[in-house]
């Protein structure tokens, strides 16, 4: 009975917040406008990763402490992206060789081959306009206004760091309920164009989230990983939070290895980070005439699964 009361309070709180937010126009919140080339959207909409010729402008001197997420932040530029980029190595203290390579390249204008999950998310976009292909000057900070990340990084030149895609010991990730409710109610507007598509949205935040993933289908193999629709459950009580959200698994990572042979109904206890779902952006833009209402639906997002917890938490579902 107590658990049911908690669930009712949680649902009511989220509903009330959604109603209050719904009365506010998109412009009432700090907006970020993201203009992407349609060719880029189509190329990467069903891919897990990107490989970029990356110029390291500015990096953290050392990784964040585990309590703050354990990442190493690296600001830079790449012709394949054409936007301000922050690359992030997860659990960076565990790969000192990779950290050293970043610092060796920092400020030299020497490009390195950097691969990892592409991520577009409005956590650090500011009240800004991000236009793909706009000329960029070198950055003097490791955290410029940006919406594009290569996060997590999986490879630097010939050095693999795929083993860093794992839970962050000593870090408290966001709980599934509040994190996914934030993602679900974030507003957006898509403006289709002949060669570009613009997405206008607000800061979403809620970076790392821990949850139980229940597959709605068997995973689909793509060039650089796996994609699968899944339901999201709370870790503590197994409560259903979100139905049918796309999950992204990076080739060579522990989560990808765990999910690849699973079937519908399979469950994993995971750590994830959200990103804008370019497949949904593409669909909404293509169907603008038939479904104009879709251009103002809530933010299209998916989850990159970046860590696997090995326990029996799935028994709570």
PLM ranges: what are they?
Residues 30-317:
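OB-fold and OB-like single-stranded nucleic-acid-recognition modules
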Residues 13-25:
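Bacterial N-terminal signal peptides
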């Amino acid at each position: 009975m107590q658990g049911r009361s908690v669930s009712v309070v949680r649902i009511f709180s989220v509903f009330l917040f959604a109603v209050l937010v719904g009365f506010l126009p998109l412009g009432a919140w700090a907006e970020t406008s993201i203009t992407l080339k349609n060719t880029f959207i189509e190329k990467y909409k069903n891919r897990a990763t990107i490989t970029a010729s990356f110029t390291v402008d500015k990096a953290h001197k050392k990784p964040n402490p585990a309590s703050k997420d354990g990442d190493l932040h690296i600001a830079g530029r790449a012709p394949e992206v054409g936007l301000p980029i922050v690359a992030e190595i997860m659990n960076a203290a565990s790969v000192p060789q990779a950290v050293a390579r970043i610092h060796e390249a920092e400020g030299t204008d020497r490009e390195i081959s950097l691969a990892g999950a592409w991520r577009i998310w409005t956590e650090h976009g500011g009240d800004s306009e991000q236009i793909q292909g706009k000329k960029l000057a070198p950055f003097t900070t490791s955290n410029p206004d940006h919406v594009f990340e290569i996060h997590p990084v999986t490879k630097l030149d010939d050095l693999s760091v795929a083993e860093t895609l794992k839970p962050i010991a000593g870090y408290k990730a966001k709980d599934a309920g509040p994190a996914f409710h934030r993602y679900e109610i974030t507003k957006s507007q898509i403006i289709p164009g002949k060669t570009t598509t613009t997405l206008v949205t607000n800061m979403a935040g809620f970076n790392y989230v821990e949850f139980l993933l229940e597959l709605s289908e068997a995973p689909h193999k793509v060039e650089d990983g796996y994609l699968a629709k899944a339901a999201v459950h709370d870790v503590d009580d197994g409560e259903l939070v979100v139905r049918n959200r796309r999950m992204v698994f990076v080739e060579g990572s522990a989560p990808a290895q765990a999910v690849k042979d699973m079937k519908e109904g399979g469950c994993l206890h995971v750590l994830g980070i959200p990103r804008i779902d370019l497949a949904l952006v593409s669909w909404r833009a293509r169907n603008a005439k038939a479904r104009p209402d879709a251009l103002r639906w809530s933010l299209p997002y998916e989850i990159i699964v970046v860590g696997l917890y090995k326990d029996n938490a799935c028994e709570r579902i």
